[in-house]
Regions:
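Terminal low-complexity tails and localization/encapsulation signals of metabolic enzymes
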Residues: 1-36, 69, 73
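Glycine-rich loop-to-alpha-helix module at the N-terminal edge of alpha/beta enzyme cores
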Residues: 32-104
């Protein structure tokens, strides 16, 4: 299999962020490197929690209908990209295609 295209940075507070540290994601079937991804620090984790808390302040007052529409759109995107997600799962975990599709 060829390398799957996927973001390799952290997504915190609505922004893609690179980190000074990274690690390799390895295909367990042949130990080939699939990607090199950003390695989050403790501070990155704290920043993500803060960003999520801040976003909740807005999300919690967003009308239910609008929240439902956003979640529905997220579902539609995830469904449309199910094969891409399954491919990443199969590559990273060495899962059979059927099992990987079952997780999407």
């Amino acid at each position: 299999m060829t390398e799957a295209a996927a973001p390799t940075s952290l997504f915190i507070g609505g922004q893609w962020l690179s980190t000074p540290a990274s690690f390799e994601v390895v295909d367990p079937s042949d130990y080939g490197v699939l990607a090199e991804v950003s390695d989050a620090s403790v501070q990155d984790g704290l920043d993500a929690v803060t960003a999520a808390h801040d976003a909740f302040q807005t999300w919690s007052v967003t009308p239910a209908r609008q929240r439902a529409e956003i979640l529905r759109r997220a579902y539609e995107i995830m469904t449309a990209e199910a094969e891409v997600c399954a491919r990443l799962i199969a590559l990273e975990n060495g899962k059979a295609w059927r099992d990987a599709m079952g997780e999407t």
